Amino acid sequence: MHQYQIHWVEHSEVKILSNIVVRLEYKERGVKSITNRRARHDAVSESKSIDYSGKKHIALVAGGMSAEREVSLVSSKGVSKALIALGYKVTFIDMGADIAFKLQEIKPDIVFNCLHGTYGEDGCLSGLLNIMRIPYTHSGVLSSALAFDKIYSRSWFLTNNINMAESIVVNKSDNIKIEPMKRPYVIKPITQGSSIGIEVIFEEDDFNFANYDFPYGDQVIIEKYIKGRELQVAVLNGKALGVLEIKLLKNRFYDYETKYTEGFAEHLCPAPIPTNLYDKLLIESEKIYKTMNCKGPARVEFLLEDQTNKLYALEINTHPGMTPLSIVPEIAAYAGINFTNLIEEIIKAASFES
């Protein structure tokens, strides 16, 4: 086991992150698990003031205030190493209320948006960078906001004739005392990623919806549970790179623990599905990406129902993870794009909206 203490310094007088220690247990294919440890304050920056003449200055924005903070920080470590290997000057910024001041102070050429969740994935940072006229990676304001909100993205999918599971929206103020839908069903927060807050309610579960406390906002989507195969498509700069299947090994659904712990799921890439279905997924994913006007990397999630072989779209993620267990880097590697080159392709697509 190797322990890494991450202590990034954004500027000579500004300490950005000093209280996160991430345990990385390496096997041949990458990280075994991601675990938070007690705060420490003695780590040393790995990318402070690394400057390569003739190369652009990249502000790597990560961390932030969302429930996905730790995933963002782990992603940023790999991204930082790739950017340094490519010869860029890298300055890390932990997203906070003073983000505009920090960006104005360091004047980067490009912002690499490595955030997940609120303020980074929902279009807020994109909007600020549009105002500041700083090119940035990943999708713009409308694309990010639309993809991040499950109510609006579902409406958009259905408008564009993309098949989705039956669902309803439940508000906390509705004070529902009975089951909102016949079991089994899925409870999904409106604006969370990494499967945070998702619950699957099966027939045998001891669960009373009247006692549900809405931990992630005053609205949830209740969606019919579909038993089937998890299929994921990586899209980079408008081109679908491949399809990966997730085979669950321990938990009943693809939850946070399964996503970020080695041994909880097996990734099959390319997905062992018929060629016509494989090609259909690539085409459908490119359609979703392009009509949503996305930019840079994205991941589109589907379910293939066991009983009917019917395909259901789940969502598009405009800020997919870049951890060693993340899906987009794995599919990119299958397509012949190593992690460093993947980051370079993301940087090449950086722009701001006028």
UniProtKB/Swiss-Prot annotation:
Chain positions recorded as Mg(2+) 2 binding sites: E315, N317
Gene3D superfamilies tied to this protein: 3.40.50.20, ATP-grasp fold, A domain, ATP-grasp fold, B domain
EC number: 6.3.2.4
Binding site for ATP: 181-232
Residues annotated as domain ATP-grasp: 154-348
Keyword DNA-binding: no
Subcellular localization(s) per the UniProt record: Cytoplasm
Pfam families registered for this protein in UniProt: Dala_Dala_lig_C, Dala_Dala_lig_N
Pathway note: Cell wall biogenesis; peptidoglycan biosynthesis
Enzyme class: ligase
Keywords carried by this UniProt record: ATP-binding, Cell shape, Cell wall biogenesis/degradation, Cytoplasm, Ligase, Magnesium, Manganese, Metal-binding, Nucleotide-binding, Peptidoglycan synthesis
UniProt family annotation: Belongs to the D-alanine--D-alanine ligase family.
Protein name, per record: D-alanine--D-alanine ligase
UniProt organism field: Rickettsia canadensis (strain McKiel)
